Amino acid sequence: MPVPNRIYLSPPHLSGLELQYVAEAFVTNWIAPVGPHVEAFEREFCDTIGAAHAVAVSSGTAAIHLALMLAGVRGGDEVAVSTFTFAASVNPIVYLGARPVFIDSERESWNMDPALLSAFLEDRARRGALPKAVVLVHIYGQSADLDPIVAACARHRVTLLEDATEALGSTYKGLAPGTIGRLGAFSFNGNKIVTTSGGGMLVSDDEALIAHARKLATQAREPAPHYEHTEIGYNYRLSNVLAAIGRGQLAVLESRVTARRRNYELYRAALAEVEGLEFMPEAHWGRHTRWHTVVTIDPTTAGVDHEDLRMALEAENIETRPVWKPMHRQPVFAGCECIGGDVADALFATGLCLPSGSSLTESDLTRVADAIRRTILERRARAAVATQVRRRRAAVHRTSLQPDATILGSPSHVRRPDLRR
């Protein structure tokens, strides 16, 4: 039997404009980490999300690293950060010799819990040891609840940095995540809703901060005719060729969001009657892009856990992936403090990301949904049969243990001797 075509989790989806812009870069010989496409990409990105200033960089990780440096994070500082995230949100904290303190999620959006963050900041304020910054991660295409987080940071004068690497196209009360904190980081990795193959963007309303970021990303070279350096810099600039790809991608952002939200709606309709399956909620405060459509699976009700389902789908050449393993459960961060943790732990124990690419066809989505439904129904039926077998065996066992009246007692028709004679 032929193996069906593989359905990937979140593959790149090109618009056709990318080739036009890349060809321009080659024809004009602008293939270095500077050029007209870089400048245009930065300008168009700002226009798209409502930011004032931006610098294109080599990755989302680079953007977070620069943001932390610009926030003044140094060795020995503490930085509060979401625990339910990818390691790239946290690694730059360690690059700088600072200590991450992980903050658990809340149930409504799966993002950082504002109440836990506020309590943590109050505690540190009483000790006179406030963190240098808060790195707020917006997960799977959905904004965190920003208002109370912004208020808590402002109350204690702690710099808020936004990791919006998964949230391009989402909204919070009409605003774009990544534009509300002091600095916002974005990623254009190959699996993102907009990709440059690899790349990132750092945005801010503070022009001086972005100018400094641009300098640091270009090996901190001073504006001199010779190579002059007064601080340590990095090779973090994005090439003109990759920026050309980004321009072609950014032009179709809205259609990509529409397609991913359509994926979610089709999954939800197809799996509505499957018990034990719940979709990541969409918080009331804004638009979820459904960058990933994510479900949680109750093994007691569904008869299958998230890993069983993942393996069953893999056997049908369908790629899925567990949700982020919380950072406080990662061996490399074993000694770090975590505020809460139960929500992120529960999500990791039950969560699964379904194929979510904007190029998926209705046939692809139906194939995935059918495979999920079939797996759960088959496992549930198998479990029901096993339960019946166990009950029958238990009944037979109980019967075998009951006393035999012909052995332990006298039959009623047997006449007993009268011992009084």
Predicted regions: what they are:
Residues 31-78, 92-94, 102-104, 126, ...:
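Phosphate-binding glycine-rich loop
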Residues 97:
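Structured binding elements
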Residues 36-43, 48-54, 115, 119, ...:
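PLP-dependent aminotransferase class I/II
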Residues 85-90:
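Conserved coil-to-alpha-helix start sites within the AMP-binding
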Residues 108-196, 201-203:
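Active-site phosphate-binding strand-loop segment of PLP-dependent enzymes
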Residues 1-31, 355, 416, 420:
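N-terminal "arm"/small-domain region of PLP-dependent enzymes with the aminotransferase-like
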